[in-house]
């Protein structure tokens, strides 16, 4: 698959096996996995890190296969969960880092362009999350308030 702002191809990777049910060797119950998800998220892990930790430490092949729900859905049912989607937060953090870099290095044209591309991705994601109802319609990204928004 191609990248968004370049003509290069993306990274190659192996595809996941298509299966709807967990493998026969997996013995944990659905409730146990959900408790582990909430516990792991409570230890300052992001939603993607939760899946990796459960895979590596506890041998959970795929949380969605076992529980029938995604990690964010499990967290929202239990009253926790991220206020903003993880991919949006990561892009905003990248934009903040680029802003700080450009404050010190005004003439760095390559990173000025990288900041423009990153903020374009943020705006595109915000538009998508407005349409799907994940973010409220009055939520707006602004570089000036981004650092305050992420620190909360």
From Swiss-Prot:
Keyword Lipid biosynthesis among UniProt keywords: no
Annotated keywords: Ribonucleoprotein, Ribosomal protein
GO biological process, one term: translation
Region (Disordered): 1-21
SMART domains in alphabetical order: Ribosomal_S13_N (SM01386), Ribosomal_S15 (SM01387)
CDD domains: Ribosomal_S15p_S13e
Molecular function in Gene Ontology: small ribosomal subunit rRNA binding; structural constituent of ribosome
Entry superkingdom: Archaea
Subunit structure: Part of the 30S ribosomal subunit.
Chain intervals with Basic residues compositional bias: 1-19
UniProt similarity note: Belongs to the universal ribosomal protein uS15 family.
Annotated GO CC locations: cytosolic small ribosomal subunit
Listed Pfam families: Ribosomal_S13_N, Ribosomal_S15
Name of protein: Small ribosomal subunit protein uS15
